[in-house]
């Protein structure tokens, strides 16, 4: 299968990309840091991904990069079978409460721009007759929690959007999967006290 992965250079995205590489899948990576993209591509090639693993610049904070990145993926892969989105930002509630600019950045990245990227992916998958859109949200959006009020609000909106997308387009061949991990020990959560049930990216 042909996979486009947004956010595969670190954390859960990297762990998932490595699993797909070990299965011998064909991968196309999109991310904002070119150096990390190229390093990840070479890593995945050594793990069994179909050669070559191509990449394209795509910045979650720059929606104008979404369509060109997916267009390049279509050209390189021939067709896209699945799009996986693990990209996102995080900040603690205390930091967000004291920094309106950071709050706007988190809400924009984790809700508005993630939805805009998914809309670009949705249109392309439906145009080819369907496919899979898998997006990582969070259990932080399931109910209001004091430590993650603002981050959780963004993830709540994202989860509802993905749920509606699946209801509307499943019969047209588009399968939308909303993954909601709990606390996972990654670079994003570094410095936070993990609960007893915390998992790892792997």
Model-identified regions with their sequence ranges:
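Conserved glycine-rich cofactor-binding loop
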Residues: 9-10
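Conserved glycine-rich Rossmann-like NAD(P)H-binding loop of the short-chain dehydrogenase/reductase
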Residues: 23-40
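Substrate-binding pocket helix/loop in short-chain dehydrogenase/reductase
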Residues: 94-107
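Active-site loop immediately N-terminal to the catalytic Tyr-X3-Lys motif
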Residues: 96, 145-149, 192
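Residue(s) in the substrate-gating loop at a strand-loop-helix junction
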Residues: 138
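SDR active-site lid
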Residues: 166-202
């Amino acid at each position: 299968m042909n996979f486009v992965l947004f956010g595969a250079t670190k954390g859960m995205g990297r762990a998932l990309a490595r699993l797909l590489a070990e299965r011998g899948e064909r991968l196309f990576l999109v991310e904002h840091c070119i150096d990390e993209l190229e390093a990840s591509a070479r890593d995945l090639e050594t793990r069994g991904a179909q050669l070559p693993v191509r990449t394209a610049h795509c910045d979650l904070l720059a929606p104008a990069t979404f369509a060109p990145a997916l267009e390049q993926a279509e050209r390189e892969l021939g067709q896209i079978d699945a799009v996986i989105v693990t990209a996102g930002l995080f900040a603690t509630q205390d930091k967000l409460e004291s920094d309106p600019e950071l709050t706007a950045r988190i809400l924009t990245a984790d809700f508005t721009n993630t939805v805009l990227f998914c809309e670009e992916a949705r249109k392309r998958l439906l145009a080819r007759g369907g496919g899979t859109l898998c997006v990582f949200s969070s259990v932080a959006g399931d109910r209001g929690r004091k430590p993650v009020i603002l981050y959780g609000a963004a993830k709540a909106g994202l989860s509802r959007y993905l749920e509606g997308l699946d209801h509307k387009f499943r019969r047209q061949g588009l399968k939308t999967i909303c993954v909601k991990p709990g606390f996972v020990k990654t670079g994003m959560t570094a410095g936070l006290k993990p609960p007893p049930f915390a998992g790892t990216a792997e």
